[in-house]
Amino acid sequence: MSATIHNVRPVTDNLGRAGSGELVPSRYAVRVGDVDVVLISDGVLPLPTSTMSTNVSEADRNAWFDGRFLQRDMFDWALNIALVRSGECLILIDSGVGDGFEYFTRAGQSMMRLESAGIDLAAITDIVITHMHMDHVGGLNVDGVKARLRPDVRIHVSAKEVAFWKDPDFSKTVMPETVPPALRKAAAKFVERYRENIVPFDQRVEIAAGVSARVTGGHTPGHCVVDVASKGEKLTFVGDAIFEVNFDHPDWQNGFEHDPEASVDVRIALLREAAETGAMLAAAHVAFPSIGHIAKNGDRFRFVPVTWDY
């Protein structure tokens, strides 16, 4: 695939000044029992719509985008990270895309937005990386970020994920041709820079009271989700297991999935789990703030966003 990446025009070019004066909301907080969760927008990633549905016809894809008054050729992928406070632990989930990617000029805002929220990077005790794609590790690769983190920060990544990126397989992906080299470079830089901080885990790890990560595979072999559970309430941050189109079409495959068929199975299992338990769900690439519940709608699912809490 050789599609050229270009920016879709944003709703507004005037975002206001950086930091707390931004006109566009960039963070949203919820409480899960005794645990605080903040979703933070890193920005958006303009990508070809074909990457959202590699196994369906152009007509079916166009119908979905037309029904949402969206462009047929390019789609702005939301990019969200999360910050979780449990007791004395402050946990960052993913880090955004960072800088250095000229075709993603409307993302890479996470570190600035953490700072504008009053978060000192040195206060972060743990980081969970759902997977090692550049839009999840890139924020940590920005020059100067490591020096602002505490020297003993624990970075939790599944052992399968670390092993995969030693020799990644892109044979089942359908990406713009510029992306695989950038993914390899970002993953290698992340491992080299944070080798002493990475704490690999097998299938599941408890990070703090009520906060755990579990491997799902699919999107990448070591992809994980993060569960926040406290006092009978639950929220699952699903990383890249679920995309915007997948509530209506969980079987639509994504061009960034290294195992598309396994990804469909993972996606359906997570959607069923949320629908049956009533747990909240949040995702890296669902429109900000991405928090909602899942309702069953025949053979499909329906995303029910939380009502914005003013």
Where are the model-predicted features located?
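Metallo-beta-lactamase
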Residues: 108, 113-119, 123, 152-215, ...
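Active-site metal-binding loops of divalent metal-dependent hydrolases
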Residues: 42-43, 95-98, 132, 160-161, ...
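Conserved beta-strand hairpin/beta-sheet module of binuclear metal-dependent hydrolase folds
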Residues: 23-116, 225-240
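Active-site environment of divalent metal-dependent phosphoester hydrolases
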Residues: 25-26, 46-48, 132-139, 164, ...
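Active-site metal-binding motif and surrounding structural segment of the metallo-beta-lactamase
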Residues: 73, 105-156
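Cap/insert and terminal regions of metallo-dependent hydrolase folds
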Residues: 104, 231-310
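Divalent metal-coordination and catalytic microenvironments
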Residues: 34, 84, 94, 124, ...
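Basic/polar N-terminal segments that are highly enriched at the extreme N-terminus
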Residues: 1-26, 307-310
